[in-house]
Amino acid sequence: MLAIVAYIGFLALFTGIAAGLLFGLRSAKIL
């Protein structure tokens, strides 16, 4: 149970970081 929660949390964190990087690169291109 705990491993599943940790795995989901890790995926959410990784997705958030990837989205942040993509958004940052897109903003840099616009600027």
Curated annotation (Swiss-Prot):
UniProt cross-references to Pfam families, sorted A to Z = PetL
- What cellular component terms from Gene Ontology apply here? cytochrome b6f complex; plasma membrane-derived thylakoid membrane
Q: Which UniProt keywords apply?
A: Electron transport, Membrane, Photosynthesis, Thylakoid, Transmembrane, Transmembrane helix, Transport
Q: Name one GO biological process term.
A: photosynthesis
Q: Which GO terms describe its molecular function?
A: electron transporter, transferring electrons within cytochrome b6/f complex of photosystem II activity
Give TM regions. Answer: 3-23
Question: What's the chief localization of this chain?
Answer: membrane
InterPro entries per the UniProt record, alphabetical: Cyt_b6/f_cplx_su6
Q: Where can this protein be found? A: Cellular thylakoid membrane
* Membrane topology according to the record: Single-pass membrane protein
- SUPFAM superfamilies this protein is in? PetL subunit of the cytochrome b6f complex
* Protein family (similarity comment): Belongs to the PetL family.
The function of this protein is: Component of the cytochrome b6-f complex, which mediates electron transfer between photosystem II (PSII) and photosystem I (PSI), cyclic electron flow around PSI, and state transitions. PetL is important for photoautotrophic growth as well as for electron transfer efficiency and stability of the cytochrome b6-f complex.
Q: How does it assemble?
A: The 4 large subunits of the cytochrome b6-f complex are cytochrome b6, subunit IV (17 kDa polypeptide, PetD), cytochrome f and the Rieske protein, while the 4 small subunits are PetG, PetL, PetM and PetN. The complex functions as a dimer.
NCBIfam families listed in its UniProt record: PRK11874.1
Q: What is this protein called?
A: Cytochrome b6-f complex subunit 6
Q: Which organism is it from?
A: Nostoc sp. (strain PCC 7120 / SAG 25.82 / UTEX 2576)
